[in-house]
């Protein structure tokens, strides 16, 4: 392989901000919700053990950001006061149906991750799985999460992330990003989300890397941060 080709692979092809091509097309949001609902079974097999461990000791007032079709509801403790904030009407319909099916109380609000409709220091924990890949501004989202968490409150997350820079998988993620963003509600396949979380100002960050099924979204992180 030539030195020039090596240099091309080492250069991160992903811009720090989404381009026009990677912004979600709102008319396709119902399709994105339908696809995510159909993929729940596949995702559940990959994430089950991580969710059980991550959510086991949750208590108090909990906010889930971007709950989508309700894939986490079966894993969240039943005695928490749960509020779900979801911007997509199609996702909210699936989520409401899932909550009824499971027979669990749920406050469902329309909103975005960058402007969470909660007062400062009012929440015991925030749950966010497979969401930071698709928000318009991950740093602003994490700042909002810090804002609403009480001192000592926790942010719990599972996210698919970028492969190592210079790898063939990273290049494949870059190539796949426009398609994922278009059909999966703005999903970015190549965000270095672990760096954004580390820079978000939490007093403690614990995370681990893991891999799921083969594909461009195989690299993942799971973890917990603590607010000051």
Describe the residue ranges of each PLM region.
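Conserved class I S-adenosyl-L-methionine
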Residues: 2-60, 71-72, 89-94, 173
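C-terminal alpha-helical "lid/dimerization" subdomain adjacent to the S-adenosyl-L-methionine
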Residues: 23, 35-45, 158-219
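Class I SAM-dependent methyltransferase SAM/SAH-binding core
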Residues: 61-63, 67-115
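Short glycine-centered segments of the SAM/dcSAM-binding site in methyltransferase folds
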Residues: 81, 152-154
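A short acidic, Gly/Pro-enriched loop at the edge of an enzyme's catalytic core
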Residues: 114-126
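A short SAM/SAH-binding and catalytic strip from SAM-dependent methyltransferases
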Residues: 124-137
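A short glycine-rich, Lys/Arg-flanked "PGG" loop and its adjoining helix->strand segment in the class I
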Residues: 139-151
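C-terminal lobe and adjacent flexible extensions of AdoMet/dcAdoMet transferase-like proteins
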Residues: 220-228
């Amino acid at each position: 392989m030539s030195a020039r080709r090596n240099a091309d692979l080492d250069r991160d092809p992903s811009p720090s901000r989404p381009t026009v091509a990677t912004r979600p097309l709102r008319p396709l949001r119902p399709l994105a919700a339908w696809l995510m609902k159909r993929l729940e079974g596949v995702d559940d097999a990959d994430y089950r053990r991580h969710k059980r461990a991550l959510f086991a000791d949750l208590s108090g007032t909990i906010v889930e950001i971007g709950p989508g079709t309700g894939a986490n509801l079966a894993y969240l403790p039943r005695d928490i006061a749960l509020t779900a904030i979801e911007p997509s009407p199609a996702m909210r319909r699936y989520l409401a149906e899932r909550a009824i099916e499971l027979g669990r109380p749920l406050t469902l609000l329309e909103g975005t991750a960058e402007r969470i409709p909660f007062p400062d220091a009012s929440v015991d924990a925030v749950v966010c799985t497979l969401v930071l890949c698709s928000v318009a501004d991950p740093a602003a989202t994490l700042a909002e999460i810090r804002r609403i968490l009480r001192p000592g409150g926790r942010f719990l997350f599972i996210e698919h992330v970028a492969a190592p820079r210079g790898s063939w998988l990273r290049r494949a993620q870059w190539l796949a990003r426009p398609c994922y963003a278009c059909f999966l509600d703005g999903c970015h396949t190549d965000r270095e989300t672990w760096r954004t979380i580390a820079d978000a100002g939490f007093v403690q960050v614990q995370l681990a890397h893991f891999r799921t099924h083969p594909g461009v979204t195989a690299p993942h992180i799971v973890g917990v941060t603590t607010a000051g």
